[in-house]
């Protein structure tokens, strides 16, 4: 795993610095899973606990800006197995395997049925699959949910290029494949394709976040497994079986899932609310964390 420390100071650093956090390690499904628990600042008592699942190729750092804007909420945030600090699962890294891991993790942490499950991007698929499959939770929150197959999104051609890129990474010898899959130029192109803000400093920070954390996967097998999982399933597969109130926090400029698909997805859940954040794409957690946190707090009130 390549480790590159961030070089650009977070615009949310002051808020995040006030949040007490601890790191624990729990062995789940063969993975030494690293888990960060963020408590409300100032000794405030948490009124609810949220377990948050980050997106593809990310780690727990990605959702920290949202955490920093929440009040009265305890957030428990693991690195997905095979990404960040967590070691891989024993077997394949499929949606089903990740959902089973999440269910087991929640039980291992002793979190009861009042827990709220949150997922961003690929994490929205994992979270939905877990809750639909029996993870006991009181509510479900999906940020930038993958509402439809990625190949059918507004920029499906980019997904097709990504498929070709990962196929190339799989076909090459191990060392060469690893190099291709961690290529800094490709990471930057991906970041440029997703960012929407015109704020130069915020853009610099977002690119630095991707440069720092987007290649912290354990090995080629893990990232290829997870990519196949991310493009072979979506939240709509599981929506009808989610029996708890659900919040969809979508973006009007998301290139992965078009807004009309989010409205369709809302109708597939037995009980779902849709909040649309304007002027942002697939990076709500980086560009509009305050708005995301406000929607989440209103939903949990």
Where in the sequence are the language-model features?
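Conserved HGGG/HGGXW glycine-rich cap/lid loop of the alpha/beta-hydrolase fold
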Residues: 34-85
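Conserved acidic catalytic loop of the alpha/beta-hydrolase fold
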Residues: 97-115
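Short glycine-enriched nucleophile-adjacent loop
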Residues: 124-135, 140
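Flexible "cap/lid" loop of the alpha/beta hydrolase fold
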Residues: 139-174
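Conserved alpha/beta-hydrolase catalytic His-Asp/Glu region
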Residues: 175-240
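Short beta-strand/loop motif that positions the catalytic acidic residue
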Residues: 242, 248-250
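Acidic catalytic loop of the alpha/beta-hydrolase fold
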Residues: 253-257
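Catalytic histidine-centered segment of alpha/beta-hydrolase-like enzymes
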Residues: 280-293
């Amino acid at each position: 795993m390549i480790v590159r420390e961030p070089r650009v100071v977070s615009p949310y650093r002051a808020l995040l610095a006030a949040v007490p956090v601890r790191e624990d390690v729990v062995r789940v499904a063969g993975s030494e899973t690293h888990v960060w628990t963020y408590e409300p600042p100032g000794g405030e008592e948490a009124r609810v606990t949220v377990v948050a699942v980050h997106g593809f190729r990310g780690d727990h750092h990605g959702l920290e800006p949202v955490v920093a804007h929440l009040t009265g909420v305890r957030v428990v945030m693991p690195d997905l197995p095979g990404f960040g600090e967590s070691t891989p699962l024993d077997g394949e890294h499929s949606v089903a395997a990740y959902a089973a891991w999440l269910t087991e993790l929640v039980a291992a942490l002793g979190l009861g049925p009042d827990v709220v499950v949150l997922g961003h991007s690929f994490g929205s698929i994992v979270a939905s699959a877990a809750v639909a499959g029996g993870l006991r939770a009181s509510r479900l929150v999906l940020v930038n949910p993958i509402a439809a197959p990625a190949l059918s999104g507004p920029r499906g051609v980019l997904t097709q290029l990504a498929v070709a890129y990962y196929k190339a990474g799989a076909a090459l010898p191990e060392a060469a494949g690893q190099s291709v899959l961690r290529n800094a130029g490709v990471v930057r192109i991906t970041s440029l394709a997703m960012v929407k803000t015109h704020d130069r400093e915020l853009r610099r920070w977002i690119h630095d976040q991707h440069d720092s954390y987007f290649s912290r996967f354990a090995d080629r097998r893990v990232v290829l497994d997870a990519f196949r999982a991310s493009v072979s399933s979506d939240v709509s597969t599981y929506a009808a079986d989610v029996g708890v109130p659900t919040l969809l926090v979508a973006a009007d400029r998301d290139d992965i899932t078009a807004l009309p698909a989010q409205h369709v997805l809302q109708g597939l859940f037995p009980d779902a609310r849709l909040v649309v954040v304007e002027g942002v794409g697939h990076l709500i957690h980086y560009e509009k964390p305050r708005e995301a946190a406000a929607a989440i707090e209103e939903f949990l009130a």
